From Swiss-Prot:
GO terms for molecular function: 1,3-beta-D-glucan synthase activity. InterPro entries: FKS1-like_dom1 (IPR026899), Glyco_trans_48_dom (IPR003440), Vta1/CALS_N (IPR039431), Vta1/CALS_N_sf (IPR023175). GO terms for cellular component: 1,3-beta-D-glucan synthase complex; plasma membrane. It catalyses: [(1->3)-beta-D-glucosyl](n) + UDP-alpha-D-glucose = [(1->3)-beta-D-glucosyl](n+1) + UDP + H(+). It is found in: Cell membrane. Keywords: Cell membrane, Cell shape, Cell wall biogenesis/degradation, Glycosyltransferase, Membrane, Transferase, Transmembrane, Transmembrane helix. Belongs to the glycosyltransferase 48 family. This is Callose synthase 7.
């Protein structure tokens, strides 16, 4: 090795630069070792997996070294040394991240191995490696050809390739022998055929996998590999500097995608990925309903159908832009080949487009030009397609990425940097939509092709001069470009702009009702009187002004996009504005002439117009004005006509539609068919009639008379300084009264929507058969038709069989056979999940073979106790006739089956055991006697029923012996003895003439000895006892005889019951027929994952919190049945699990009960298991195997053949991709959590071989001598204990930098999905095995011809929330979420037709969406709620969204108060951003009126209504504040006529329904009633109220209102991680204060002051019950907002915790802020961050903040005039003096503060003198005020109420004008004022908590309140709260223990609280 060592370690022996490494080897080795240390030696990372990203190419070498280490350690050493040399050449200075540590670690390892490794085959390294290479080739590759799988061969070829590379560095070229060279050339020639593959090993030789033998795959490959007549590309001499591989690119191509790659320069990984994608698509579509005989080629219709799907959007785009489509097919061309070329080209563009995939029309533009190039290459030559014509090809495989995608990506990156991490206004930068909509205009063709990078799209005016020292991968911000088509302006006016028709309807209806109510009669019929009707016509004037407002908003808010608009669009905006202005002038003028006896302004207009105007001119004007609305109504009634006109691109139609709506590429033709239109119109007509009637009779009419009285009153005695004392009509009073009423009027439609949606949803759910099977009793009663229903719905009938239309109770044996396979697998799965025990499993199983039993063998849980009951019935039967007894038995359906089965099974078991023919004859004769006596109706006379119980007992003993241990010595004798006893009982005790049978047997056998009887039944066949199916029969019979309890209690687990009943119930619901697996749609599942938990570690399971509670211990108490089942499973001796296996099983058991990735993956992989089982079943039926039952164990060849075919079809139909965005970083990380996530994900890949993991790989590569980061999308699979790379596709840059994280994570991985459908699953979801059977039914919903309707593009599925059983909060959230994903979405889909995509597990039409922007939108901030935008986009582009409830998936939710609040805040933020978005604007404007109403009230309108609800309380209380402080309440409202009217309170009572959360509860009650029964629903409702559900919902109302309003006003939306923990933990007071201070506490305290002031100074309505209810509801709101976080905080009222929280809060308040001080450490840091939104808001936002702050000045203004010291003076001087006092107080406080800073440390005496002087001055002033001026104690308290709000107003204004106050030097004073207020608020909130904490029972009550639901589930919270776990108990480390080994030490002195993990 000497020569190799010296020659291999550098050109000059040991290079100098390696000396530091060697000298630091010990130190660096320690660092490296630390990097790879792992507590479990078996899980220690392998060195090949620790390679730094800049050295990624050496990882395969190290993997090979590890693979051959056991075989030849010396050669493995040489491989590692070669890797080290290569690493040193790649990075000689070790500048890359982690390179130095890795090289040091590797060098240290080499030094160790050099001493211990020995030569095995030769004496020198060159000879050793050559001999090993030859041996390896001969033993593995040569012998493995045709025998090993492609996957195994791929690995062998990879090893051989690396070995030869190493060999060349060890052996000089001249010394490599011929055999080695020959083998190496053979490897080089074939290695590409054996690359690692995803699903299809396309070019692999040797043993074919089953999937490659499928005829559809062969046909698809044949079509894709048709390269006849394609010209061969060549490369220009300019590419001479390319490496050898690239120069070889032009030599050959195997398929059309390779040809496209050579022409355009697509990456090899992209080509391989899309090749498989296209083949699978073709195969899956083509095989559908096709005869497999003579199946050799793809049908032309298949390619045509695929073309139509992929290019529907492209063709629409071409028509819209009026340009010719380049999908051209010249005469004489191979149309199929050309079609596949076009499809392949689109797929390759899409596969490499990265972030540009979010821009579908940009992709259309790219494809448009490249398709033109393809056509030019193929048909543009003079001598076309002769095979020898060469065309210029792309220079390298990254040409397309570099020249097309990267420039567009850089534009995106440049724009997103203007976003400033969400702080910049949306109008300041262009998002994905803006850049994509650039291609909606014909001006996009100015980009030309190849794209001109100097075009306006790429270059900004100030980018000519580059920024100095700018890195090459950076982009300058440049000058802002205009928005495209729309500007996302941050204003509430967006709500009016988007939904103007709704607001106009509500305003005009309100005006109409007020006019009608103003009539003296008050009757609604008054509208038909002439004067009222004439007045009602004024609504058109209002309408004109509202239209003017709409036109103005359109003009102003779209101004930022004007530069991108066409002239016709700008003219439309201007014309609309001018027309609206004209009508706003004309209608009032014409109306003025029509008024009789005009006065005032109307008289002026009337005289000005002149006498030539006729009185009816106004009527003509109205007719002309409403003409467009009449046309709109016609279009509404004829949706097909509207749809045709909107989609038309004819110029005349475009001109006609120009006025109605702006021409836009999307949002055309979204109108529904007539029946759907009728349904949602009926819904809304009924709702609006109810709403308007209620508003008229309850809200408006009762207020009219008091308003008239107030209008006529004149008040002179004001109690404050009135600025307008001579004003008439008391406008202020009227506004104060009508303000809340108007707000309630605009909001209460939301209440009516909740009521009507609940009613319609309940009715529709009932008609959908929901909840027909709710309990196990119901399941048991209907189980006899379940097999028929199962086969009718979930199994395809063979060809030629008609589908049964009606289910009946006749049972077909083949139905039972089909059903039993699936049912038993379902039951076994639940056992594997520990939901049921072994015994419960046996009771639930259906026999897997029919045997010789003549009746249906039902599961034992249906037959439980039937045999004992029948025996008792027979024993006690007093009648004489057999018929009566048998009639009694048959009256119980299952009892008859049980009796017959038991009899026949006993007969078969005994008969099968006997070997002696005479013994068998006795048994036959006994059975004959039984049968003939039954037929002849003499059974009771021939048999004694009294002996039956004794026989049953003996049979039970007999069966138990048969199932006992076969190895026991007396096993046979025991069986013989009991068998003889049984025969004796039958013949002697049961049969009347039984002795005759024995005597005949004796005579027939010729034996007359009397003792022969004792020798009978001794010859038995014990081999049967080892037969599995025979033992199953014995077990089943034993269960029939022994199970006594009622089957209603089986299974015990509530979850198992729920799953069984839902599955059975779903079989009776409407669903499409199941196709054969081969005919079903193929689909993928995609799960985005970031850094969440994958699998809990052993340390996490056993880590105790401060109360000694572990996750494991906690879960044992929550799931006691499942824990018991788990212990039974792992302790089963048959499994023989090692301690290590038990530890792994324990980790999985815990992880499968949390919200972990492992749970999600397990659930999704059930799809594959179900598909394989369904395939298996179909194959067995096709081959008529075993009467429809599964093949027996003996038929192993059939089973293997069927299994291989089933797996192949499952590969074809299902793919699961988990997008682990940072998997690569986790793999290289040294942090234990990241390493754990990496290892756990790897183990998932190894456990589930078909699981695929996609991740973004970040590498350091040297480009032009400089290191830079390069990003790749990579797809992995598990292979031989490691991950194996399948595809690697280079990206133009970091994809997640452009948009929101989750959609970008999905987008990079979507290219690796397959199939026609795509299901999106979050990592906190679960799936259930039995639900997977229905997947092929669900996918049939996409079949466009199924119901004659347009096919859906998104299928919505229901969810089951599995986190509701822990605490009351979890239960509330679970119920709320469940009602939303069931009844809520049911109504949205039908009848309202406005369901979108609300998260997962929805199923997308994959091809539709990947050609239209993907399955989500990703623009920063605006698409924060990325999932719903997928639904918006789908609907706008002509999609159709449905909802289906016969299938469900599981979903977890956050269960802690703070986590729930984070979630609600995130959703409210998202809705705020939606309000600003173009999608909501376009949907709101382009839906018809009623569908628009549905859209509004189910999306942003719900949150706006929440905000109005809160605003109503404010308006009401501030209105009352105005009335009581001004004295108007006493003067006006106390008059008898006004006092009698309490309409305002009645209206507010309706509002409080929303406020208290009853709207949330209504759908919950209906859904629970439907699915569990209305008694249960009523009970749950009562329990929820007792557990303070209304407090929770009222609190969340405040969360919604705050974050929705703040988002629209100021922005600041961000993704809020909410956690996936098990349950809640105690949150400190400071944490709660930080989280809820601004959203709830400030608002709550403001309402407290309002209520106190009104209580002190107001006097009206005190006796009214409605007033009391309103007051109560407001105090309830206040209490909820102030104290809900503490009520729902575990241990929130425990004294010690309260003391600790106060200490922590004081410390936090006192800490100073500064750079680097986090917000949870210092109040100053938090206070600064709380104002972050004001730093970045615009001028409008600041002005609004100041205006809102001015309301706090009203308190001081009103209260000072009510002070006794004011002596009823109402001059303005009083108010001025109050300000002087306030400023004096603030000045004194400032002096104290400054004195403390100046004198506090060095001049203590001076500071004390200052304080003394101030104190004396204060006493003097107070004395004078009390004695001289008449100040009272009540005045002091009133002054506090007056001045506190004023100080808060000053503080808010100071924050809004921060820069101004800083400039004036007052900012420190503002900060100190803020700190003082925080202290006051904290003290006010904390005091009640501290008082309640004094009483221990409060804490106990709170615990019961929080965890009552868990108590009802058996959760022993009392044990957890009472004491810690017994430390002496054997640890829960491994689960070789039973449940009893986990005890609790009862200690009443331990802390009475508990923390659990999040």
């Amino acid at each position: 090795m000497a020569s190799t060592s010296s020659g291999g370690r550098g050109e000059d022996g040991r290079p100098p630069q390696m000396q530091p490494v060697r000298s630091m080897s010990r130190k660096m080795t320690r660092a490296g070792t630390m990097m790879i240390e792992h507590p479990n030696e078996d899980e220690r990372p392998i060195d090949s997996e620790l390679v730094p990203s800049s050295l990624a190419s050496i990882a395969p070498i190290l993997r090979v070294a590890n693979d051959i280490d056991q075989d030849n350690a010396r050669v493995a050493y040489l491989c590692r040394f070669h890797a080290f040399e290569k690493a040193h050449r790649m990075d000689p200075t070790s500048s890359g991240r982690g390179v130095r540590q890795f090289k040091t670690y590797l060098l240290h390892k080499l030094e160790e191995e050099e001493e211990i490794t020995e030569h095995m085959l030769a004496k020198s390294d060159p000879r050793e490696i050559q001999l090993y290479y030859q041996t390896f080739y001969e033993n593995n590759i040569q012998d493995g050809e045709g025998k090993k799988t492609p996957e195994e061969m791929a690995k062998l070829y990879q090893i051989a390739t690396v070995l030869y590379d190493v060999l060349k560095t060890v052996v000089p070229q001249a010394r490599i022998d011929d055999k080695t060279l020959r083998y190496a050339k053979e490897v080089e020639r074939k290695k590409e055929q054996y690359e690692h593959y995803n699903i299809l090993p396309l070019y692999a030789l040797g043993a074919k996998t089953a999937v490659m033998e499928l005829p559809e795959i062969k046909a698809a490959i044949l079509a894709v590999c048709n390269v006849d007549n394609l010209p061969r590309p060549r490369f220009h001499s300019a590419s001479a500097n390319l490496d050898e591989v690239d120069r070889e690119r032009g030599r050959s191509f195997n398929d059309i995608l390779e040809w496209l790659a050579l022409v355009f320069g697509f990456q090899r990984g992209n080509v391989a990925n899309q090749r498989e994608h296209l083949i699978l698509l073709l195969a899956n579509i083509d095989v559908r309903k096709r005869d497999l005989e003579n199946y050799v080629e793809i049908k032309p219709s298949t390619v045509r159908k695929l073309m139509e799907k992929y290019f529907k959007n492209y063709n629409s785009w071409c028509k819209y832009l009026r340009c010719d489509s380049y999908l051209r097919f010249p005469a004489g061309c191979d149309k199929q080949q050309l079609s596949l070329l076009y499809i392949g080209l689109y797929l390759l563009i899409w596969g490499e487009a990265s972030n540009v995939r979010f821009m579908p029309e940009c992709l259309c533009y790219i494809f448009h030009n490249m398709a033109n190039e393809v056509h030019g290459i193929l048909f543009g030559n003079v001598y076309p397609v002769t095979g020898d014509t060469y065309e210029a090809g792309a220079p390298d495989e990254e040409a397309f990425l570099r020249n097309v995608i990267t420039p567009i990506y850089q534009v995106l990156r440049k724009e997103v940097r203007r976003n400033k991490n969400g702080k910049a206004s949306h109008s300041k930068w262009r998002n994905y939509d803006d850049l994509n909509e650039y291609f909606w205009d014909k001006r996009c063709f100015r980009l030309k092709w190849p794209m001109n990078f100097k075009a306006d799209f790429f270059i900004h005016t100030d980018e000519i001069s580059q920024v100095p020292n700018q890195r090459h991968d950076q982009v300058s911000h440049g000058k802002r470009k205009p928005k495209t088509n729309f500007v996302e302006a941050r204003t509430f006016w967006n709500l009016y702009r988007s939904f103007d028709r709704m607001w106009m309807f509500l305003v005009l209806s309100l005006q109409t009702m007020i006019i009608v109510a103003w009539h003296p009669s008050g009757s609604i019929l008054a509208i038909f009187t002439e004067d009222v009707f004439r007045n009602v016509l004024t609504i058109f004037i209002t309408s004109a002004f509202l239209n003017l407002l709409q036109a103005t908003l359109d003009l102003v808010l779209s101004f930022g996009a004007w530069k991108s608009l066409k002239f016709s669009q700008i003219m439309r905006y201007i014309t609309k504005f001018l027309m609206a202005a004209m009508w706003a002038i004309m209608l009032p003028i014409t109306y003025s002439k029509s008024v009789q006896n005009p006065t005032g302004l109307i008289k002026f207009f009337s005289s000005w117009v002149g006498s030539w105007l006729h009185r009816s001119l106004y009527d003509y004007a109205i007719a002309l004005y409403v003409l467009p609305n009449i046309l709109a109504a016609v279009f509404f009634l004829l949706p097909p006509l509207r749809r045709i006109m909107e989609r038309s691109n004819m110029r005349i139609v475009t001109l006609i539609m120009w006025w109605a709506q702006p021409k836009l590429y999307i949002g055309r033709g979204m109108h529904e068919e007539m029946f759907a239109l009728f349904k949602y119109t009926f819904f809304w007509v009924m709702l609006l009639l109810s709403k308007l009637a209620f508003s008229y009779y309850v809200e408006i009419l009762p207020l009219v008379n008091p308003t008239k009285l107030i209008w006529d009153m004149h008040v002179v005695n004001y109690e404050w300084h009135e600025f307008f004392p001579n004003a008439t009509h008391n406008i202020g009073v009227i506004i104060a009264i009508w303000g809340p009423i108007v707000l309630v009027y605009f909001m209460d439609t939301q209440i009516w929507y909740a009521i009507f949606s609940t009613l319609f949803g309940g009715i529709y759910g009932a008609f959908s058969h929901l909840g027909e099977i709710r309990t196990l009793g119901m399941l048991r009663s209907r189980f006899k038709v379940v097999p028929s229903a199962f086969c009718s719905k979930l199994t395809p009938l063979p060809l030629g069989h008609a589908k049964r239309k009606h289910l009946d109770e006749t049972v077909d044996e083949k139905d039972i056979a089909r059903f039993s396979q699936m049912w038993n697998k379902f039951i076994h799965t639940m056992r594997d999940e520990d939901l049921i025990s072994d015994r419960e499993r046996d009771l639930l199983l259906v026999p897997s073979s029919s045997g010789d039993v003549t009746v249906v063998q039902w599961p034992p849980f249906l037959l439980a106790s039937k045999i004992p009951i029948a025996l008792d019935m027979a024993k006690d039967f007093k009648g004489k006739e057999d018929v009566d007894l048998f009639k009694k038995i048959k009256s119980e359906y299952y009892m008859h089956y049980a009796v017959v089965e038991a009899y026949e099974t006993v007969r078969d078991i005994i008969y099968g055991l006997l070997q002696d023919e005479s013994d068998k004859r006795i048994v036959r004769e006994i059975c004959y006697e039984v049968d003939i006596s039954i037929q002849q109706h003499r059974f009771l006379s021939e048999f004694r029923m009294t002996g039956m119980p004794l026989l049953s007992d003996k049979l039970e003993k007999f069966l138990k012996i048969l199932l006992s241990d076969y190895e026991e010595d007396d096993y046979k004798s025991q069986i013989i003895n009991v068998l003889q006893d049984i025969i004796e009982i039958i013949t002697q005790d049961v049969m009347v003439n039984g002795h005759e049978i024995l005597e005949r047997a004796h005579l027939q056998s010729g034996d007359i000895e009397s003792d022969k009887k004792e020798q009978r039944f001794e010859k038995i066949d014990l081999s049967l006892t080892q037969n599995i199916s025979w033992r199953e029969k014995v077990v089943r019979l034993l269960l029939l005889l022994t199970v006594k309890e009622s089957a209603i209690n089986i299974p015990q687990s509530l979850e198992a019951r729920r799953r069984m009943t839902f599955f059975a119930n779903s079989l009776f619901m409407n669903m499409p027929d199941a196709p054969r697996v081969r005919d079903m749609l193929s689909f993928s599942v995609l799960t985005p994952y970031y850094k969440e938990d994958v699998l809990y570690s052993e340390e996490e399971l056993n880590k105790e919190n401060e109360d000694g509670i572990t996750i494991l211990f906690y879960l044992q108490r929550i799931y006691p049945e499942e824990w018991s089942n788990y212990c039974e499973r792992v302790n089963d001796l048959k499994r023989n699990l090692s301690e290590k296996d038990k530890a792994e099983q324990l980790r999985q058991w815990v992880s499968y009960r949390g919200q972990t990735l492992s749970r999600t993956v397990r659930g999704m992989m059930y799809y594959r298991v179900a598909l394989e089982l369904q395939c298996f079943q179909e194959y067995t039926e096709e081959n008529a195997t075993n009467g429809g039952y599964l093949p027996s164990e003996s038929n192993e060849d059939d089973r293997k053949a069927f299994s291989d075919r089933a797996r192949a079809l499952a590969d074809l139909k299902f793919t699961y991709v988990v997008s682990c965005q940072v998997y690569g970083n986790q793999k290289k990380s040294s942090e234990s959590r990241d390493r754990s996530c990496y290892n756990n994900i790897l183990q998932l890949m190894l456990k589930y071989p078909s699981l695929r993991v996609a991740y973004i790989d970040e590498r350091e590569e040297t480009v032009n001598g400089k290191s830079q980061k390069v990003f790749y999308s990579v797809l992995l699979k598990g292979c031989d204990k490691l991950d194996e790379e399948i595809y690697r596709i280079k990206l133009p840059g970091p994809p997640t930098e452009i948009g929101e994280g989750k959609p970008e994570n999905q987008n990079h991985a979507i290219i690796f999905t397959r199939g026609e459908a795509l299901q999106t699953i979050d990592m906190n979801q679960d799936n259930y095995f039995e639900e997977c059977f229905k997947m092929r039914n669900v996918l049939q919903e996409f079949d466009e011809g199924r119901r004659g309707k347009r096919n859906p593009t998104i299928l919505g599925l229901r969810e089951h929330i599995f986190t509701g059983s822990v605490s009351s909060l979890a239960w509330f959230m679970s119920n709320q979420e469940t009602s939303f994903v069931t009844i809520g979405q049911r109504v949205l889909a039908n009848p309202l037709r406005v369901r979108f995509h609300y998260g997962h597990p929805d199923i997308f039409d994959r091809i539709f969406h990947i050609t239209r922007g993907g399955i989500s939108k990703a623009s920063k901030i605006i698409n924060l709620s990325e999932d719903i935008f997928a639904g918006y986009n789908s609907t706008l582009r002509g999609g159709y969204v449905t909802h289906h409830e016969y299938i469900q998936a599981g979903k977890g939710r956050d269960v802690g108060m703070n986590q729930i609040s984070f979630f609600e805040a995130k959703v409210a933020n998202g809705n705020g951003e939606q309000t600003l978005s173009r999608d909501v604007y376009r949907l709101g404007r382009r839906f018809d009126f009623y569908r628009m109403l549905s859209f509004y009230f189910t999306t942003v309108g719900f949150y706006f209504s929440s905000m109005i609800t809160v605003l109503t309380v404010y308006v009401f209380l501030y209105g009352r504040l105005y009335l009581v402080l001004s004295g108007l309440e006493k003067n006006i409202l106390q008059s008898a006529s006004v006092h009698e009217s309490n309409a305002l309170e009645q209206a507010l009572a309706a509002q409080s329904v929303f406020q208290l959360g009853f709207l949330m509860v209504l759908p919950m009650v209906m859904e629970i009633g439907l699915e569990k029964g209305f008694r249960t629903a009523l009970g749950d409702f009562i329990i929820m109220q007792l557990q303070l559900a209304s407090v929770f919902f009222t609190f969340q109302l405040g969360t919604k209102a705050h974050y929705f309003g703040r988002t629209i006003l100021h922005g600041g939306s961000k993704y809020r991680a909410t956690g996936r923990g098990f349950v809640v933990f105690h949150a400190k007071f400071a944490e709660n204060y930080r989280l809820y201070s601004r959203s709830h506490f400030v608002k709550g305290l403001e309402l407290v002051i309002l209520l106190v002031v009104y209580q002190v100074y107001g006097t009206s309505y005190r006796s009214s019950s409605t007033y009391m209810y309103i007051t109560f509801s407001m105090w309830f709101l206040v209490t909820s907002w102030l104290f809900a976080p503490f009520i729902f905080n575990p241990s929130g009222f425990e004294w010690q915790k309260t003391v600790d929280d106060w200490t922590d809060w004081k410390r936090w308040m006192g800490n100073r802020g500064g750079i680097g001080i986090v917000l949870d450490k210092s109040w100053e840091s938090w206070w600064d961050i709380e104002q972050e939104h004001l730093k970045h808001t615009n001028l409008r936002g600041r002005v609004l903040e100041i205006l809102l702050a001015l309301r706090f000045l009203l308190y001081q203004y009103g209260i000072v005039y009510h002070l006794n010291i004011a002596r009823r003076h109402t001059t303005f001087l009083v108010y001025g003096l109050s300000w002087a006092i306030l400023l004096s107080v603030l000045l004194v406080l400032k002096m104290v503060s400054m004195g403390r800073r100046k004198f506090g440390t060095d001049f203590q005496v001076m500071f004390r003198i200052l304080k003394a002087l101030l104190f004396l001055g204060f006493l003097s002033v107070m004395t004078v005020l009390f004695v001289v001026c008449g100040l009272t104690i009540s005045d002091l308290f009133a002054s506090i109420l007056a001045f506190l709000p004023t100080g808060w107003a000053i503080l808010l204004i100071g924050q809004a004008l921060r820069s101004v106050f800083k400039g004036l030097g007052f900012w420190d004073s503002v900060k100190e004022l803020g700190r003082a207020y925080e202290y006051i608020m904290g003290l006010v909130i904390f005091t009640p908590i501290a008082v309640l904490s004094w009483f221990p029972f409060v804490s106990e009550f709170q615990t019961r309140l929080l965890f009552n639901q868990a108590f009802s589930r058996g959760l022993q919270i009392s044990m957890i709260l009472a004491g810690k776990k017994d430390k002496e108990t054997p640890s829960t480390k491994y689960l070789g223990h039973t449940e009893e080994s986990f005890g609790l030490e009862h200690d009443t002195n331990t802390f009475n609280h508990y923390y659990l993990w999040t």
